[in-house]
Amino acid sequence: MDKLQLWQRYQNWLYYHEGLGIYLDISRMRFDDPFVDRLKPKFDKAFQDMEALEAGAIANPDEGRMVGHYWLRAPELAPNDEARKEITEPLAAIADFVTKVHNTTIKPPTAEKFTDVLSIGIGGSALGPQFVAEALSSDFPPMAIHFIDNSDPAGIDRILTRLGDRLKSTLVIVTSKSGGTPETRNGMLEVKAAYEAKGLDFAPHAVAVTMPGSKMDQFAENWLARFPMQDWVGGRTSELSAVGLLPAALQGIDIQAMLAGAKEMDVATRVKDLKTNPAALLALAWYYSGNGKGEKDMVILPYKDSLLLFSRYLQQLVMESLGKETDLDGNTVYQGIAVYGNKGSTDQHAYVQQLREGVPNFFATFIEVLEDRQGESIELDPGITSGDYLSGFIQGTRQALYENNRDSVTITIPQVNPRIVGALIALYERTVSFYGSLVNVNAYHQPGVEAGKKMAASILSLQTEIQKVIKESVGSLDLVTLAEKAGDPEAVEAVYKIVRHLAANGRGVTLDGDLANPSSLKVSAG
């Protein structure tokens, strides 16, 4: 197409939300009208599926659960009074708690006020709060936030070192739906030990976000506060529940504006017309690009520093939801869309070279922010500001990709604020739901994650047996013998990696032999 034809296509496929000031442009996806017509029955079903989901249907059949994250910003739509209370009561409790923390009605035992927040959680309990903190936290928030989102001892040490003496004025939020997530438990126990090492009582500094009756709920009985998670909200869609709203509010972020923006977008994405429903349009673009099979990766390119973590947040939302081996009918399908990204225009000096000229196995999503900054910008060249350069880079990169047959979507937002961030979260949540329906997968469970957890648990059980065998043995053992004595003769490689790790950390294990030839190694206590 020439430039005028592209301009006409842009206008034909442009979506604009007047209330939010958000534009969605899918004109650089090269589908045609017959393709859209063929998908109409699938979208009709997707609209019906979403209506049933919001009415309280068991949309997660594998776990027998309702899917209710859309109710979080519209409690009146919840199917019963109990569900409505599960939304409104925690919201009121968060508002009351945050007010009391900020005005020092609630304060730590040995400091005048809480100065910092330490959020301990993983997956959806971390990625959403991290994205929102990066996007919306002010330069001088009422409380600075820090995250422990892994079981990495060095990473934990780094956070605790940064806090230093401020640990006594740090409010710790421990987030785990079941209370049994190993990484979160580990982080909590490490931090609890750090408090005790300084002679501080952990409980008056700690808050839990978990399901009522969970292991964490019971463990946190004497903590400063407990906030509930709903059974019908998954981790990757929990940012607008207590999981994300509590840490955001403590940073001074307007959580009511986030909820309002999400609610406005939800209204727009309930429209049962493809061309006037932004989430349906985005799902159409995804389906076209990957041929309904996820054949192309999704590259997220936000041209705003504060949106740096958006790609990491979307990585979990999209990949954990859509990456499924089987569909709802039990057929093996291997669905999913790989997501990665960084930020523009940094990416133009990193991997855009490959996007433009390498393997065409992706589609790009540009995120454009119209407002450059608060306040005026200086001119770097006559009539040109740094923001003009950034705008030029996004338009130029989009055109350069299109000219070499690389498709893209562009989302344009007026500015980065709580209302718009809430709307973006809602837009992508609904798009994932629509796409899940289009390809007939359960977008609300994660059996692959659970499989990994079980395998990790089996490794730790094997380690316990190995340590016992080594302690009781006289002399050294080769790896094969050690595996046999530990009760798993086929797990020689796992045994090798366990003892190598123990030896590297001075954990009572010595390795003798040629490290380049693992079969030669002898293991002994020491």
UniProtKB/Swiss-Prot annotation:
Annotated organism of origin: Rippkaea orientalis (strain PCC 8801 / RF-1) (Cyanothece sp. (strain PCC 8801))
Main location: cytoplasm
PROSITE patterns in UniProt: P_GLUCOSE_ISOMERASE_2, P_GLUCOSE_ISOMERASE_3
Entry's transmembrane regions: none
EC number: 5.3.1.9
Matches recorded under InterPro entries: G6P_Isomerase (IPR001672), Phosphoglucose_isomerase_CS (IPR018189), SIS_dom_sf (IPR046348), SIS_PGI_1 (IPR035476), SIS_PGI_2 (IPR035482)
SUPFAM superfamilies: SIS domain
The protein's name: Glucose-6-phosphate isomerase
Superkingdom per UniProt: Bacteria
Active site: 320, 349, 453
Matching Pfam families: PGI
